[in-house]
């Protein structure tokens, strides 16, 4: 999105594939200091304190967004550790209402394109609560044939790489599998989401050393 848009992750629904007309709704807001856009402070405007992961669709009425972010929509964001979260929602519903979400949890504060609008995010389920000793990178998501969401991410401890981890969340928002190390050497592909096929999650990526590309898989129980 451009600098003049709301600071948020936005979900768009294509209404007409022929001309790509779509309806867009903000689903997860970013904090910026009040008046940052008026001051034309592009550093503050573009510092989202978040990173997009991906969206997976389990059914026509059940989809999930996975990303990382700081928890607060206030100046606390400057000092908070970014955590992994999921929002499971009905893509056809009004995402500005709590009834659109399967998962529960709200966060409120100041957002908008200038940091001066009161905003509330719904359905935010935090999947991690790491201290600043740990950091998360490349959050990703795919969905199984059973409709369970497999969340993958890279974890670091004091900037030292620990590996790829997986969390499984069912369609109702329950954690079916807590964070489990999948590989100590694999990295995730930041350019493409993993895919699910024949009981496994598949992705291509690198290892800790070298430039070769490898095919990785993780058997989902």
Residue ranges and their predicted role:
Residues 1-221:
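Extracellular, repeat-based ectodomains that mediate carbohydrate processing or recognition
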């Amino acid at each position: 999105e451009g600098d003049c848009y709301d600071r948020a992750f936005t979900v768009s629904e294509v209404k007409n594939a022929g001309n790509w007309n779509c309806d867009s709704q903000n689903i997860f807001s970013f904090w910026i200091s009040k008046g940052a856009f008026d001051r034309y402070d592009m550093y503050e405007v573009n510092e989202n304190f978040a990173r997009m992961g991906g969206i997976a669709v389990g059914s026509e009425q059940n989809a999930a967004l996975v990303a990382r972010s700081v928890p607060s929509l206030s100046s606390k964001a400057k000092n908070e550790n970014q955590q992994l979260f999921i929002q499971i929602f009905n893509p056809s519903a009004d995402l500005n209402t709590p009834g659109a979400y399967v998962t529960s949890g709200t966060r409120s504060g100041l957002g908008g394109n200038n940091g001066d609008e009161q905003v509330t995010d719904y359905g935010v389920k935090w999947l991690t609560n790491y201290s600043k000793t740990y950091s998360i990178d490349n959050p990703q998501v795919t969905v199984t044939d059973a409709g369970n969401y497999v969340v993958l991410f890279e974890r670091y401890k004091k900037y030292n790489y620990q590996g790829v981890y997986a969390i499984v969340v069912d369609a109702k928002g329950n954690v079916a599998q807590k964070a489990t190390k999948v590989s100590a050497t694999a990295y995730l592909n930041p350019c493409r989401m993993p895919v699910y096929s024949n009981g496994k999650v598949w992705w291509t990526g690198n290892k800790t050393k070298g430039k070769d590309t490898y095919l990785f898989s993780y058997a989902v129980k």
